[in-house]
Amino acid sequence: SGTSLTDQILASNTKVSSLGEVGYADEMAVQVKELSGKHYPQGLSELTQEDISLLRATFLGKISQSHSDNVVLIDKTPMNFQYLGLLAEVFPSAKFIHCSRNPMDNCFSIFKLAFADDQDYAHDLKSLGDHYRLYKGLMDQWKEMYPQRILDVRYEDTVSDIQEQCVRLVEFLDLDFEPEMLEFYSTKRLVRTLSASQVRKPIYKSS
């Protein structure tokens, strides 16, 4: 869907650090159950301001000091879309970049990749289609709830005109455009995703 590409472009800005796919939102959802006695999302409405402050402090406590001076921190975990409501409440100033792609291309790309066995939907095309519909419905709901805090970035648009998408991204995040973002593939950082090799190359349209 272009998450790794968008992440690498943004991480090429000197004011941005990417945490990678850390999965902290998963852990936060478990904490919601511990604090409220109810699973997320039902438990979200039961949280006190003290609970929310604790969730925020726990999340931030896991972030390395090396990221502390940056204006923007990115958690690019793809499954974070499930927890957008939780993240929005815990971090009132957070913004969300929704990376999307043509549904058929997106699903087939997932199907071809060797995802973990706990993601059973990724190994069956019908299950992938069902999963995509659920994801799309949830994202539509989040966009209604937080219209000013979500930016849609389509993979096809980035490939077609990377400079225009860079401008959209920095304006959304209140950052300055830096030319290095256009040469994201030159940025020296560790990328631990199945798309790692792709973000080491200039934009191409064959994926």
Which residues does each predicted region cover?
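Conserved nucleotide-binding/hydrolysis micro-motifs of P-loop NTPases
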Residues: G23-A25, P103-N106, T158-V159
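A secondary-structure boundary/capping signal
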Residues: E21, R154-Y155
